[in-house]
Amino acid sequence: MKVLVYFQPSPKHDNFEGARMRKTIKGALEVIGQKYTSNLYDEYDVAHFMSPEDESKLAVPLERKVPIIVSALFGEDDPATRFLNHKNKGGKLIVTLKPKALRLLNKASLVLVPSESAKELLIENGVTSPIDIIVPGVNLARFNFSREDEKELFYRYFREDKNKKIVLAMGEYTNNMNGISSLINAAKKREDVEFYYIGYETFAANYGNCKRVIRSAPKNVHFKTILPDDIYRSMLLNADVFMLPGYSLSGIISVQEAMAANCQLIVRDSAVYSELLVNEKTAYIADNSETLTSLCLDYLDSKIKPTTEEAYNKISSYNLENFGHKLCELYNSLVTNK
């Protein structure tokens, strides 16, 4: 059996959650000796896609009657792998599937999602294809703390003081930047801590309220766009806190990597899958911005205990080998029953 693992965005988009998911899938298949290709026009027995932008590419395996798997809702921070639209209507966040995402998913032989709540969300939004739950694997070796050279990259790249604590936040640049106050208010009270906000730069980042937020933030808040993988990984290895201040669903890939890097997770409830994280056990989870700010400050002041050990133990069970075997079981089932 041979598998097509397909995700080929423009170079501008090929350095975020989609690229890391592709690397994870390929790594899992390599660990168990499963052959794969990235060439859409090669010969293969099953095709694995992960982006709504590739809807038109499904024509090739469909014409060949090759089973198609689509991984969905794992990389929602990445525009190239984002399946959802988020709109604020009357003060309430409305989440819907992108039209092209719905078309893609309903052409699939099988859809893979990371949690039961993700499955329910797809069904509520009109997905009729079979859906299975599988949590992506993590290459724990990429977050090995013995690699001092990798830890040093962050300090060389940003010229930071090694004695300062680091808070890393993941989000997006939107017109209103909902939730960003939880990060900024924490930074205002801890000038001795450096706060980094990482997100994919959009048109909104240069205009309106988003630009005002960035300009008015304290000097210890640094707004950055997506970084090269080695720099981002080094940042994770040095971060004391990984924060999700926004309301939109975040990418499970980024959350898993923060767990593997032993960062303390402080996240908004709506930004994560409830099945992955448990409040006060593997993360600190809150609904409102004031509580997120307080949790961040309390952790930095050692007033609340870390949940990093339990989070690392949980993420360790999602290793590449197990992920590879689960994928191959699904691939074989589709090939056998086509």
Residue ranges and their predicted role:
Residues E17, K305-N332:
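A charged, aromatic-enriched C-terminal amphipathic alpha-helix characteristic of glycosyltransferases
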Residues E76, G91-V111:
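Membrane-proximal helix-turn-helix segments that form the acceptor-binding/catalytic region
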Residues E160-N178, I184-K188:
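Conserved donor-binding/catalytic core segment of Leloir-type glycosyltransferases
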Residues M170, E194-N209, T225:
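Glycosyltransferase donor-sugar binding loop
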Residues G208-D230:
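Nucleotide-activated donor-binding/catalytic signature segment of Leloir-type glycosyltransferases, i.e.
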Residues Y247:
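Aromatic "clamp/platform" in nucleotide-sugar-dependent glycosyltransferases that forms part
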Residues Q264-V267:
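Short hydrophobic beta-strand element within catalytic cores of glycosyltransferases
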Residues N279-E290, L297-K303:
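Conserved acidic donor-binding segment of nucleotide-sugar-dependent glycosyltransferases
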